[in-house]
Amino acid sequence: MSGDRRLQGLALKVGPLGEHDRLLTLLSDDVGVVRLAVPGARRPRSSLAAAVPLTCLDLQVVGRRGLARVRQLRVLRSYSGLGQRLDTLASAQALAELAIALVSSDDPVPGLLEAVLIHLDRLERLSRTPGEEADLCLANVVQAGVHLLALGGYGLPLQACCRSGAALTPPIGQWEWRCSVLPEEGLALGALAGARLQLNPSELALLQRLPRPDLPRRSNGELLGPRPVWLKLLALLECWCRAHLPRPVRSLAMVRDCLSAAPLSDHEPT
């Protein structure tokens, strides 16, 4: 049929549309973020009822003007296991919101879908082990935020002072040293008045390692950095997103509230 096309991508958000339909927000390598009507998806036993958030879908879509409609769908991968833990579910929702804020319709961001799926895979592995440390979930969502912001063109400027251009080289061991987080500008050397946050040398060094593929760990495999530091880096992400993105990423606050209250691990300082 004229106007039919196939789309593959990740369902970021699904909401009601009228009495029986759903509105699907899909992240695709081909078209960026696109909104699609899913007719009858809210009816019992609908063949399109599998259009749910955090699911990779293969879609047959009809219509190129206005709100296109899903004619058929096939589930390629479901991340429903994320719901086994509140922290992993909140983190996944934050990544979905961040992707919506970073990508426009008909303006795909190369590599963003792949990066989101990599981090969802990591979160789902955590969700399968209820006893796994909450700190790993927190660190994963912070690192994922750093990766997605960089891919979307809003990366944190981690290597140079936003005021002087001098290198941001943390002097490990000099605990009086500080750099300031200025959400509208970047990171600046020194403890500046009006800074949203200040980082000490070890906090900045940890932040500068996050663009790498893997989480920073000690030689024994334990995660680097105590929970208060990771919560501080999450707060940095929140204020950076508020200052630069066209829409809020509200689930980051849910992640913060959820993980602030989680029990500390055995090796975590109190």
Curated annotation (Swiss-Prot):
Keywords: DNA damage, DNA recombination, DNA repair. Involved in DNA repair and RecF pathway recombination. One of its GO terms (cellular component) is bacterial nucleoid. It comes from the Bacteria. It comes from Synechococcus sp. (strain WH7803). SUPFAM superfamilies: ArfGap/RecO-like zinc finger, Nucleic acid-binding proteins. Belongs to the RecO family. This is DNA repair protein RecO.
